[in-house]
Amino acid sequence: MTTATTATTATTAGRRAWAGYVAAGAALAYAAPHFWWGAGVGATFPGDFASAPHGTWEAAVGYWVMGAVAVAGAVVALALVRPRGRRLPRRTLCALSLTASVGMTLWGFTYFAMQYLLAAGRVVSAPAFAAKDAHPQAAWGLFWYGLFVLWGLMLGRAAWTRLRGGEDRGALSR
């Protein structure tokens, strides 16, 4: 292989890999606040942090486990685009990633659909959630669910690119 071919292949691989890197970044951006919320720091919490569970199994799952799952999601996103990810079965990795992508994207878009329906007066919050929905910190939900949508879309793009790239193509394996 010539130097020009190697450079072209590396450039093509870089163009194909961007979605995996964006997905990994979104996953880590989602993970970080879960860890600081678990440590008791309420910054960027989408609601009233004082009324959120602390010191319970709900808090452990909601903060620490979800943070760890998001870090694992970043590792999966990188496995789709990095050479070490070639050790994993391509179809299995892509199937799991595409399934997660669809779920995360739908979850995020559902949040925005519900916010629209609330604003349009088509639905009314249940009394148990009305105060949470009216809290000024609830606006952070727009950011976090937007990040969730971005993560889902980019994970899907990276998985699709990996699946379509095939195991024997050199562009992504370098």
Model-found features: residue ranges?
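Alpha-helical transmembrane segments and their helix-start/interface "positive-inside/aromatic belt" motifs
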Residues: 2, 10-27, 91-101
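Loop-to-transmembrane helix junctions at the membrane interface
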Residues: 79-102, 106
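C-terminal TM-helix exit segments that contain a strictly Trp-centered aromatic cap at the helix terminus
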Residues: 29-41, 102-121
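Individual transmembrane alpha-helices with interfacial aromatic-anchor signatures
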Residues: 95-96, 130-151
